[in-house]
Amino acid sequence: MKYHLLKPLFLVSALLISTLQGVEHFWDEIPLSPSTTRPAEVLDDYWNSEFHRVNREVADAQKTQLIFLGDSITWSWSLGPETGKEIWENQFAAYKPINMGNSGDITPVMLHRVTRGNLDFADGQHPKVAVLLCGINNLGVSQSAGGREQWHLGSHCPPADIANGIRAIAQVFRRRLPGTRLIMMATLPVSDDGNRAKCRQASAINAALVRNDNEVAFVDLQDKFLLPDGSLNKQLFTDGTHLTAEGYRIWAKGIEPLILKFMEAPPLKPVKIMLIGDSVTEGLDSDGSYRRYMDGMLRREGHLIDFVGSRRQHNDDKTEPDNYEYDVDHEGHWGKDSAWMAENLPRLLASNVPDVAVIHLGTEDILSSNAAAESLTDGILQNIGKLVDALRAKNGNIRIVLSTIIPVKGKESVVSLLNLKISRYVQSNSTRQCQVVLADPHKGFDVSKDVSHDNPLPNAAGARKMARVFADVIHNTDLEGQTEKAEIRH
């Protein structure tokens, strides 16, 4: 068996290197593809019954420590024919496991499931370990039930697309269940030689991207299901794809040591980050949201994070629960000024208390007020001070990143004055216990290139610049135990 924990696959064939297309890290962005990485549902009674079964079990879960997400191979282990049920009970019953298998599932359908309830455990009920096995159906399914939605799948589905779909699901696990360690399984071999080769290629791509054993581990059991000549061991399969009792026994034995290790490991403690602001923080859409890019930047740098807040949407009226590309929780409030935030933040902190807060505030005040610059900026700063006081009252060790605001066309002088006062505030209000540090996205922000059509919201380029500034400040701030860093080897 092969565990890819801290050791990536360094010897990848030239074919696989070409399919990686610049992807070097588990947390790199995943290209959107209708065939493998765009969430989609199946509209038939069976699929929906299983989807809602899992949602009910998750909602009712009490001390569930282990979950399995997959397709019919996973489903059959405890819910199908009796081939694997005894093994399931003997190996995993003590963990009160939930079987999240659903027959026929392909990666875009599984993305729909994990972003629409299958991972919505109550606070305090998140499992310790999750096991993910999927991908094989991407090589066999061409359309949903009844042909309502066509997917470009089947034998021509590239291994890189399958790998991307699996990694997308894995990313959802880590974002939605940050305290749950994940075991990513290599896709098991099948009888068809061509598909078996593609399974190996897809698995090699993901094995090369899983670089630590603190949060995610990659387990490759493919060779355990093959004969010495490389052909399928038919004694382990009922039909060339699904497993016999002995096949399930091999799977259980292969992951048992890692499950035990993860169960006994110290709990993962993500840093809770609250992004506080107005329209700039909420964002016009996903592309123009700095939150999207900041999430990936921090994770690629090894930070174990969890964005927190009461909101999960942009101003385009599209809620974000289907979005697996970043953690969507925030406290950006469209059209609200600093006075509104100062008044309402204590209420919002009743549900979420962050370890780190990032404040970008003042843009709405400047856009909506004709007051003199001096009095206007003084008022904004007073409200920011109230936010800082409210945050410190909830968490005496909080780290606060206070940001200059990005340029506002036609309001350059008042923006400059506010940013000067923000800088001075930071210098005089940071303490050893409750650090306040400055982030300056205004510097280097080009209004001719980085602002969207809706002044002063950033476009994608501007949002990336903001995210880079905030991520760098958080990365370089002495968090004194506020953050855990994953053990990553490059």
Whereabouts are the PLM-identified features?
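Sec-exported extracytoplasmic/periplasmic mature domains
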Residues: 115, 135, 171-178, 211, ...
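Conserved SGNH/GDSL esterase-like catalytic core that processes O-acyl groups on lipids
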Residues: 27-168, 195-200, 280-382, 411-416, ...
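Loop/turn elements at helix/coil->beta-strand transitions in domains of secreted/extracellular proteins
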Residues: 63-65, 94-96, 125-130, 177-181, ...
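Bacterial N-terminal signal peptides that target proteins for export
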Residues: 1-9
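Catalytic His-Asp segment of secreted/periplasmic serine-dependent ester chemistry enzymes
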Residues: 189-267, 323-328, 333, 406-490
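Active-site segments of SGNH/GDSL-like serine hydrolases
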Residues: 133-139, 145-148, 170-204, 225-228, ...
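Preference for well-ordered, secondary-structure-rich cores of eukaryotic proteins
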Residues: 91-99, 117-129, 141-143, 152-183, ...
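Bacterial N-terminal signal peptides
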Residues: 8-18
